[in-house]
Amino acid sequence: MKLRKSLGQHMLVDRRVISRIVGYAELSEDDVVLEVGCGTGNLTSALLRKCSVVGIEKDPLMVKRLRERFSDFIGKGRFRLIQGDALKVDFPYFTKFVANIPYKISSPLTFKLLKTDFRLAVVMYQREFAERLCGEDNRLGVISKTYCKAEILEIVKPSSFNPPPKVESAIVRIVPEPEVFVENRELFEKFVTFAFSMRRKRMGKIVQEFRKRYGVELAVNKNLAEKRPEELGARKFAEIVVGE
């Protein structure tokens, strides 16, 4: 089957990697897995051996192939396939999220996931995105800490995919347990986004500029005032916002 680069299609074909992903998800028969970007169904097949699966696939050619390949599971109600854009369709009920997602939608899809109710997610990302998600020296990593705990489980080589991507990938486990609590999430995310848009400036100056732009007075102590955004981490950002 000819794959479409416009959809970022890189099919996971390494059975050992697929097996480890399923293992990381710690699935039971009672689980319902949501898989975004089912592709040709290699991961889907392994998931269906463990539990029920709901898949979301945008490519109509892939949808046709999936319906043919898993017609028995569909007939038994073990596999439900939704054709559509995962960023636009409402997520159905699920307990765990397991997917090799299209890398081009990593950020919006991850935040959509984090705002839903789930027990555990095991996601294949581009390595660079995974490192930002699990780090604290960037906007994505800082904000994500207020939603979840995320850790890289392993790095996956391009040869595990068809066609091979130009970059390495990473399997990430996400547990919906916030590492940092923030009461005013809207203000926190606005301030973090603003700060990292001015990452070369020090926090004292950034707080001043934020006040001028939005009329919000934030408190920053002398020590933090001399630091740049990538030096703070989620907890220090939260301390600044709490002091507003």
UniProtKB/Swiss-Prot annotation:
The keyword Iron does not apply. Its EC number is 2.1.1.-. Keywords: Cytoplasm, Methyltransferase, RNA-binding, rRNA processing, S-adenosyl-L-methionine, Transferase. It is found in: Cytoplasm. S-adenosyl-L-methionine binds at H10, L12, G37, E57, D85, N100. Transmembrane segments: none annotated. One of its GO terms (molecular function) is RNA binding. Signal peptide: none annotated. Its main location: cytoplasm. GO terms for cellular component: cytoplasm. SUPFAM superfamilies: S-adenosyl-L-methionine-dependent methyltransferases. Specifically dimethylates two adjacent adenosines in the loop of a conserved hairpin near the 3'-end of 16S rRNA in the 30S particle. May play a critical role in biogenesis of 30S subunits. PANTHER family: DIMETHYLADENOSINE TRANSFERASE, DIMETHYLADENOSINE TRANSFERASE-RELATED. Belongs to the class I-like SAM-binding methyltransferase superfamily. rRNA adenine N(6)-methyltransferase family. RsmA subfamily. This is Probable ribosomal RNA small subunit methyltransferase A. The gene is rsmA.
